[in-house]
Amino acid sequence: MKLDLHTHCSEATSRYTPTVDIVEEIIAAVKAGGLDGIGITEHYNRAYGYKVKEIVDRHFNGEILVIPGQEIDKGSLHVVVLYLPDDVVFRFIGHPGYPPAADLASGIDQSIHGLELRNPLHNDEMDEGMIRRLAEEHHLLLLSNSDAHFLCDIGKYYTEIEVEDLCARAR
């Protein structure tokens, strides 16, 4: 599946509560990006993603996959948390290298399952060699995501992976 696992649809739509009309716009953006689904990862707000998922499932017959999540701070790092089926939680460090003072290596522990390798908002601040080395050392999944703050940016970067593979990594 083509999945963009780091998006901010509330900011992208300027709506803090999703409606059927707003979700229709999100679905159109996901499809325009050639994706099968997205992770909705608002800053400190997991409820938005769950509400979008509920509307997609109820009103749009599950037309796209929606993985609810949130982006939180862990020290100076930004951690993206995805809430997968069967209460499985997958966590990855978003845009390592931003903020610049973040100590990536010290933020990697057993709760982290992946590292974002590509992110169009922060590629200039990310050290690909270091990210790849740390991913290999810690057996972490490398991900590419848009970090979209506008609907038109959804799918600019994405990861090809099955949800089952994310679940297996997180167990």
Question: Which residue stretches match the model-derived regions?
Answer:
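Charged catalytic cores and adjacent phosphate/nucleic-acid-binding surfaces used
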Residues: 1-5, 9-19, 24, 28, ...
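Divalent metal-dependent hydrolysis catalytic cores, especially in the metallo-beta-lactamase
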Residues: 26-45
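Active-site flanking residues adjacent to catalytic metal/cofactor-binding acidic residues
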Residues: 5, 41, 70, 94, ...
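Hydrophobic/aromatic-rich structural module bridging two neighboring secondary-structure elements via a short loop
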Residues: 66-72
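N-terminal-biased segments
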Residues: 87-95
